[in-house]
């Protein structure tokens, strides 16, 4: 995967990518703009597990894998099949898991079973959330009059159903100058046909395909975009350990919030706020790439502040002991719908305790929401660091956190000392942003600050 560490190869790569300014932008849909991939994966795992379980109960000859390993095998196969048209993905799944032999099911039947479970567009189905930063990016491109297209493996009918359940509904589709669906092409991704179609509908000649910037979340999509001659940004929907599968992309970002359009000759976002009292120094191990020279640390105020409330639970036991930075962890499970609105990364805001320590007041807080790559965590965590010294632990007390701004993506570090230094710098960004009055919109939450 590309690295942000400065060297001649990286400089040459950046120059090559920026050589031809991008004039048009093409988006994938699922996993890039709307968060359907996780929903589909859960359904696939459930359906396939049920099939294998029934087969196992009716036959003495079946996989010797434990249930846990079997589910991980299914989940891996579902992830690897992402980005394709439904039947193509089902064919890959059946082949990878040997389902015709192990469960007596063919690709078409598997697809029908999964579709019956999903039932996009039906009443009562939970809203499909937008990917963090999706609407911000689409609105900005529209405002700057940059032509955009949608190139999705989803069929026209399925697109209609999905957008009915989408958080923003049909509104999102109004931002596109052209829409291309999977049933309009003979071959699906990783074949480049759909990106050729999108380019043509945007009025871009084949020899100018390099002026199109594509946003994709899967290796199949990246392969298709590059085969079409486009420049491709990957915002991976796969787990971090699979990031090597995105080596073909021109850029890899952790989320749409981290995208720096100016690196591609497009207008620069204007909503980041510099904290001029905190110098910017690129972190060792930060995997983001940017050709932009920054002088100061910065933050991005959330379009909507987010409240997270729950009992303080015991975390991994490393905040105080290893880092000297005590965190008050919250349980992810009951807060899943809220944190799905946030990209994994570092945020700041405020926190208050609602139990015996309520009298300590409202405290500024820096928090990690994600997978903490330094410790290679496999499950998501919410780890607020309250910038206040407490006399005692407060496990099981109710903690309310108001998430106000995004600071940066998660990144890995080579040493614990580097990690600690970075966390303390995040705290400085939080303190300085509030001290300098750089965060507006807090008045709308004045009732929250009342204890």
Description of each model-found segment:
Residues 1-23, 27, 55-69, 257, ...:
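Eukaryotic N-terminal low-complexity, Ser/Thr- and Lys/Arg-rich leader segments
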Residues 2-8, 12-22, 139, 155-288:
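Asp-based, Mg2+/Mn2+-dependent phosphohydrolase catalytic module
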Residues 18-144, 157-160:
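N-terminal helical cap/lid subdomain that shapes the substrate entry/recognition surface
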Residues 33, 130, 148, 187, ...:
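Conserved SAM-binding loop
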Residues 49, 230, 424-428:
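Solvent-exposed alpha-helix faces
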Residues 82, 103, 127, 152, ...:
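A structural signal for short, well-ordered beta-strand elements
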């Amino acid at each position: 995967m590309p690295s942000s560490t400065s060297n001649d190869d990286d400089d040459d790569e950046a120059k090559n990518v920026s050589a031809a300014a991008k004039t048009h932008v093409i988006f994938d849909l699922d996993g890039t703009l709307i968060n359907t991939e996780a929903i589909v994966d859960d359904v696939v795992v459930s359906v396939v597990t049920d099939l294998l379980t029934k087969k196992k109960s009716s036959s003495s000859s079946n996989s010797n894998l434990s249930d846990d390993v079997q589910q991980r095998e299914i989940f891996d196969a579902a992830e690897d099949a992402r980005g394709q048209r439904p039947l193509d993905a089902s064919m890959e799944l059946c082949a990878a898991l040997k389902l015709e032999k192990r469960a007596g099911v063919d690709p078409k039947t598997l697809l029908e079973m999964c579709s019956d479970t999903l039932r996009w567009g039906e009443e009562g189905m939970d809203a499909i959330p937008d990917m963090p930063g999706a609407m911000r990016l689409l609105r900005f491109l529209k405002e700057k009059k940059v032509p955009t297209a949608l190139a999705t493996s989803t069929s026209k009918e399925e697109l209609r159903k999905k957008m009915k359940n989408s958080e923003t509904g049909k509104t999102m589709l109004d931002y596109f100058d052209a829409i291309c669906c999977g049933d309009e092409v003979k071959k699906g991704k990783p074949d480049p046909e759909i990106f050729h179609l999108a380019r043509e509908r945007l009025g871009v000649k084949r020899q100018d395909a390099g002026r199109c910037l594509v946003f994709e979340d899967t290796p199949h999509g990246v392969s298709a975009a590059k085969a079409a001659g486009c420049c491709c940004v990957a915002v991976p929907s796969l787990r971090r350990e699979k990031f090597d599968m995105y080596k073909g992309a021109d850029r890899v970002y952790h989320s749409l919030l981290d995208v720096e359009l100016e690196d591609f000759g497009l207008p620069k976002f204007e909503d980041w706020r510099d904290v001029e009292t905190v110098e910017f120094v690129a972190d060792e191990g930060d995997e983001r790439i940017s050709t932009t020279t920054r002088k100061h640390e910065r933050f991005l105020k959330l379009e909507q502040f987010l409240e997270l409330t729950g009992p303080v639970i015991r975390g991994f036991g490393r905040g105080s002991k290893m880092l000297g930075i005590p965190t008050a962890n919250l349980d992810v499970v009951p807060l899943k719908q809220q944190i799905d609105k946030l990209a994994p990364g570092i945020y700041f805001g405020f926190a208050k305790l609602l139990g015996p320590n309520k009298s300590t007041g409202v405290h500024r807080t820096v928090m990690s929401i994600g997978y903490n790559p330094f410790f290679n965590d496999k499950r998501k965590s919410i780890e607020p660091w309250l910038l206040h010294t407490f006399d005692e632990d407060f496990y099981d007390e109710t903690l309310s956190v108001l998430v106000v701004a995004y600071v940066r993506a998660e990144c890995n570090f080579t040493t614990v000392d580097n990690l600690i230094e970075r966390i303390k710098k995040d705290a400085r960004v939080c303190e300085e942003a509030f001290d300098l009055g750089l965060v507006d919109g807090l008045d709308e939450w004045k009732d929250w600050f009342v204890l």
